[in-house]
């Protein structure tokens, strides 16, 4: 994990760049470098994960070409051996050192060949231009904007570009930029033909592909840790990891000091798999004191993203301050693939599939953004096994009639896939879902709402919300978040498509709060 930045022109002197680039130094506190490309700049803040020596420092160079990459290239060692046989020489153990040889061999078609999560900027000396690309899901962040002289700037986070570019835009996942154009090289969610295997075959494939996705993400030269909420998704990641590694893993859970719903479940999972488990407690005052900091590091005003980030950020902060962990595995992206509580209301399998496509396509603005910022702000790398490209493509291709909840249990396919392994206690494997922001303690969301109520009278709320035409705040809580967002990202609200909400066009989903707690089918999931 690291921070990258690239300038196509020299509108800024080298001495002016740190004022913008160092806003994300937490992403790479180990080493920093700004490289002159001749016509512009490539910048790199490093957090060493693979190839820990100084030889792994970027930008990497090859015959005048240069690259900076924030990413993990899975299965890079066989590729490296193939390239070595072709005569390429390598000086480090870094996975990213193979990028320029791959670019020389395959050109722009290289991006579609990568099994990776990445954001990268390449300087091509032959065309004297920058090429940028982002992984198909957008797990690694990348933004862009234009300078007054027409030059383009790429950066890991939006905050790098505030005050530099008039409009800051998220770089679209699954695209590369070359010759002044954005080109789509990957589409994981458009399915041309569904898989019609029987239930047992589908579940066996889900099992095998998820285990493979976890296994890939356990490869690191730096210490590993695991976020464990006690819910199905993170519990599976932890249990599979413990099985694959064959040793005790370090797990971390957080909850409110009063009513931490998930801590007891996380503890049960940790005990079951024999983990070295740490519990972190947060107070109401900590949540309120940290709110502005969290919104500024997230770069969003979305309600559910901010709520869910409070616990995650404070947990990762404790991990950073109290351990040597450099990599954290998390359970994000399962909901988008297998369904939320609200997708139980999908009127048809086709509607379920379209909703899954929308949610996966927009992940980079919501859950993936949350995981990246909360973890990277604490100088740790996030890895997301449910985002494995092979796994995502397969689950999206499963006949939606099989994925719809006709089983009286959400995410049935995922649960059934691991039923015979006994990797988890049955009461965890078959436990109903609770939203993370609720599961750390119902009182946290209630505290945030109550705090927002104290900030505005009803009249002030109605007056102030009218200032915003795009994604207009609709509660005092959403107005509070928007005002803090505008303080750090003035006029940049279109970076986020809109508020994350259930599909209001579905019966049972016309609600005014993103929390599953307001849905009629929430049941016992949050107890």
Regions found by a protein language model. Name each.
Residues 6, 100, 104, 314-320, ...:
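Short, amphipathic alpha-helical segments that act as regulatory/interfacial helices
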Residues 13, 92-95, 114, 199-206, ...:
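Hydrophobic (often cysteine-bearing) scaffold residues that line and stabilize catalytic clefts
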Residues 258-316, 322, 339-353, 373, ...:
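ATP-dependent adenylate-handling ligase core
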Residues 31, 90-95, 405, 422-435, ...:
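Short, surface-exposed acidic
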Residues 1-300, 322, 326:
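Cysteine-centered catalytic environments shared across enzyme families
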Residues 325-330, 334-352, 362-473:
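Mid-to-C-terminal catalytic subdomains of enzymes
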Residues 157-160, 200-201, 205, 209, ...:
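Peripheral terminal appendages
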Residues 98, 209, 213, 269, ...:
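Amphipathic alpha-helical segments that form well-ordered structural scaffolds
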């Amino acid at each position: 994990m690291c921070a990258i930045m690239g300038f196509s022109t020299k509108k800024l002197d080298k001495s002016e760049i740190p004022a913008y680039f160092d806003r994300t130094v937490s992403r790479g506190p180990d080493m920093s470098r700004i490289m002159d490309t001749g016509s512009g700049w490539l910048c790199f803040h490093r957090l060493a994960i693979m190839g820990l020596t100084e030889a792994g420092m970027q930008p990497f160079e090859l015959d005048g070409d240069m690259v900076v990459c924030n990413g993990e290239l899975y299965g890079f060692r066989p590729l490296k051996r193939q390239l070595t046989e072709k005569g390429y020489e390598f000086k480090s153990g870094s996975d990213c050192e193979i990028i320029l040889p791959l670019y020389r061999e395959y050109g722009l078609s290289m991006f579609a060949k990568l099994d990776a999560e990445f954001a990268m900027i390449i300087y091509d000396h032959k065309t004297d231009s920058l090429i940028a690309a982002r992984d198909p899901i957008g797990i690694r962040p990348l933004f862009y904007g234009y300078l007054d002289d027409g030059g383009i700037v790429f950066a890991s986070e939006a905050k790098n570009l505030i005050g530099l570019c008039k409009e800051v835009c998220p770089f679209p996942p699954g695209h590369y930029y070359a010759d002044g154009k954005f080109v789509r090289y990957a589409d994981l969610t458009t399915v041309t033909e569904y898989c019609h295997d029987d239930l047992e075959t589908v579940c066996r494939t889900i099992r095998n592909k998820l285990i493979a996705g976890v296994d890939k993400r356990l490869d690191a030269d730096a210490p590993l840790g695991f976020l464990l909420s006690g819910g199905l998704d993170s519990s599976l990641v932890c249990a599979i990891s413990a099985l694959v590694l064959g040793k005790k893993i370090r797990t971390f859970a957080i909850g409110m000091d009063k009513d931490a719903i998930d801590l007891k479940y996380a503890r049960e999972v940790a005990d079951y798999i024999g983990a070295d488990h740490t519990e972190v407690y947060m107070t109401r005052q900590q949540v309120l004191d940290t709110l502005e900091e969290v919104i500024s590091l997230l770069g969003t005003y979305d309600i559910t993203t901010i709520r869910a980030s409070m616990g995650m950020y404070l947990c990762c902060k404790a991990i950073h301050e109290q351990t040597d962990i450099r990599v954290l595995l998390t359970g994000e992206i399962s909901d988008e693939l297998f369904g939320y509580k609200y997708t139980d209301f999908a009127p048809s399998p086709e509607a379920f599939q379209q909703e899954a496509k929308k949610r996966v396509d927009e992940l980079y603005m919501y859950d993936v953004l949350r995981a990246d910022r909360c973890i990277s702000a604490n100088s740790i790398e996030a890895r997301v096994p449910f985002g494995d490209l092979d796994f995502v493509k397969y689950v999206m291709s499963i006949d939606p009639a099989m994925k719809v909840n006709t089983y009286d249990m959400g995410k049935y396919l995922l649960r059934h896939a691991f039923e015979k392994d006994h990797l988890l206690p049955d009461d965890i494997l078959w436990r109903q879902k609770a939203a993370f922001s609720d599961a750390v303690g119902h009182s946290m969301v209630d505290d945030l709402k109550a705090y927002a109520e104290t900030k505005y009278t009803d009249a002030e709320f109605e007056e102030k919300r009218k200032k915003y035409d795009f994604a207009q705040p609709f509660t005092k809580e959403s107005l509070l978040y928007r005002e803090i967002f505008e303080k750090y990202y003035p006029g940049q609200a279109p970076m986020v498509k809109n508020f994350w909400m259930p599909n209001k066009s579905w019966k049972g989903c016309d609600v005014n709060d993103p929390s599953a707690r307001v849905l009629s089918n929430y049941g016992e999931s949050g107890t």
